[in-house]
C-alpha cells in the first residue's frame, strides 16, 4: 500500500522524519 502525507516538499530537508512518523502512524515497517 502507498500512503500520502500533506507535507510541504519545498521545506523538506531530507531528514527522513516524515517517513519515520508515517511508519509509526500506520504501524508498518515497510
Swiss-Prot record:
Note on cofactor: Binds 4 [4Fe-4S] cluster.
Subcellular location as annotated: Periplasm
Induction section of the entry: Fully induced in the presence of arsenate.
Cofactor(s) needed: [4Fe-4S] cluster
Keyword Metal-binding: yes
UniProt: [4Fe-4S] cluster 2 binding residues: 22
InterPro entries assigned to the protein according to its UniProt record, in alphabetical order: 4Fe4S_Fe-S-bd
Swiss-Prot/TrEMBL keywords: 4Fe-4S, Electron transport, Iron, Iron-sulfur, Metal-binding, Periplasm, Transport
Residues annotated as binding [4Fe-4S] cluster 1: 12, 15, 18
One MF term in the entry's GO annotations: 4 iron, 4 sulfur cluster binding
UniProt key word Flavoprotein: no
GO CC, alphabetical: periplasmic space
Subunit field text: Heterodimer composed of one large subunit (ArrA) and one small subunit (ArrB).
Function: Component of the arsenate respiratory reductase (Arr) complex, which catalyzes the reduction of arsenate (As(V)) to arsenite (As(III)). ArrB is probably the electron transfer subunit.
Miscellaneous field: May also use zinc as a cofactor.
Protein name: Arsenate respiratory reductase iron-sulfur subunit ArrB
Name of encoding gene: arrB
